[in-house]
């Protein structure tokens, strides 16, 4: 059900015609993972006429853009999200410290400043703020508690888009099909 809801969200709100769906797992091989994940995979394979299932995806490939929807349980998903946030923070802080070490690194920063600012803007978590709660009879978007007004506005934007595209009504139609 969550794969179908995620697919509906990707189609309706993001505008992806045929979203690729994967299950988050400890490996891409069919024999890996808990039995409930293997059972979910079999179910998704059997729904190939209505869902574009691409099999398992490992945590280290989440950000590669190979698939559009990654399905997981809430516990595992939260760990994956917090790990990504922590890694991004660690990378940012380490880079800042490295660029302060010597006159040469400071000079290097000045030469790469425009590229680094573009990279920082691309990685800004506030742009992606807003976790959508799917499967409810209404629109619920949770904002990260540590965000600022810009991040909060983006979460409101997600909710607005869901309302604009009549996500609840249209997703019911997709799920019944």
Model region roles, listed by residue range:
Residues 56-63:
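Glycine-rich oxoanion-binding loops at beta->alpha junctions
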Residues 1-55:
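Glycine-rich phosphate/diphosphate-binding loop of Rossmann-like nucleotide-binding domains
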Residues 173-177:
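Conserved small/polar residues in nucleotide/adenosyl-binding loops
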Residues 66-70, 74-172:
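Glycine-rich phosphate/nucleotide-binding loop
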